């Protein structure tokens, strides 16, 4: 299967290992470790032969980190994952089944078995749905239909970057789907080690305010 996994991490610890272990070793994984910790890079690449851990020159955030990884992708498809996501059985295979059904798409998203959805019941309704936007914890990218927009806007360090991307894709009539038959587990709010909870909370609050301001200025 023509796929590369992309994960952006910042001292994600055991959470990241749990994510990697849910991915079949035959798929290459590019990890952007935004903490720029050489020991983490060495540890990951030693434990997992399919992992290429890249240390950027500075913390690039979610958008910049993903863009750096996506610039290295040579496959036709990429699966963007948060570190706090675990793939359910046959998840990747089901992405390709759906990709062969909808063909000309930009993004396909799964559902998280932990989350509720406003417009449908993912347990009862398994039909593929075209949607306006998806949540960024897991996104299956059709690379040829996203390269034109340069993927994420680097001005979003954290938050709203996937909403912005989906909005730009829709303006070019690029389709976005969610498929309830594709399932992951998303343990939201736990993408880093507990020791840095307080500074990470302060950082998240600041970036939420900035991203909200920038998004509204950009699109209104």
Where do the model's predicted regions map?
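Short, well-formed alpha-helical segments that are part of the catalytic scaffolds
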Residues: 7-25
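A conserved acidic beta->alpha catalytic loop
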Residues: 22, 33-42
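Short beta-strand/loop segment that forms part of the nucleotide-sugar
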Residues: 26-36, 54-56
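Glycine-rich, basic loop-to-helix element that forms the pyrophosphate-binding segment
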Residues: 55-73
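Short aromatic/hydrophobic "clamp" motif used to bind/position activated sugar donors
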Residues: 78
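Conserved donor NDP-sugar-binding/catalytic core segment of glycosyltransferases
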Residues: 85-120
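A short, conserved alpha-helix in the catalytic core of glycosyltransferases
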Residues: 138-141, 145-185, 190
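Active-site-adjacent helix/loop segment of glycosyltransferases
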Residues: 167-220
């Amino acid at each position: 299967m023509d796929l590369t996994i992309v994960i952006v991490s910042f001292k994600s610890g055991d959470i990241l290992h749990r994510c990697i272990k849910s991915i079949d070793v035959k798929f290459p994984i590019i990890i952007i470790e935004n903490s720029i910790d050489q020991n983490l890079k060495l540890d990951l690449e030693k434990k997992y032969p399919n992992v290429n851990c890249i240390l950027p020159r500075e913390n690039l955030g979610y958008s910049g980190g993903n863009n750096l990884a996506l610039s290295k992708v040579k496959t036709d498809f990429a699966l963007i994952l948060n570190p706090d996501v675990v793939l359910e059985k046959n998840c990747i295979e089901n992405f390709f089944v759906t990709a062969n059904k909808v063909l000309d798409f930009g993004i396909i998203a799964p559902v998280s078995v932990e989350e509720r959805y406003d417009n449908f019941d993912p347990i009862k309704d398994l039909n593929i749905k075209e949607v306006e936007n998806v949540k960024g914890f897991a996104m299956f990218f059709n690379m040829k239909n996203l390269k034109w927009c340069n993927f994420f806007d680097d001005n979003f360090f954290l938050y709203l970057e996937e909403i912005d991307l989906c909005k730009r894709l829709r303006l070019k009539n690029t389709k976005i789907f969610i498929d309830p038959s594709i399932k992951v587990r998303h343990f939201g709010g736990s993408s880093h080690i507990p020791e840095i909870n307080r500074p990470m909370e302060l950082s998240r609050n600041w970036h939420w305010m900035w991203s909200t301001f920038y998004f509204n200025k950009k699109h209104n």
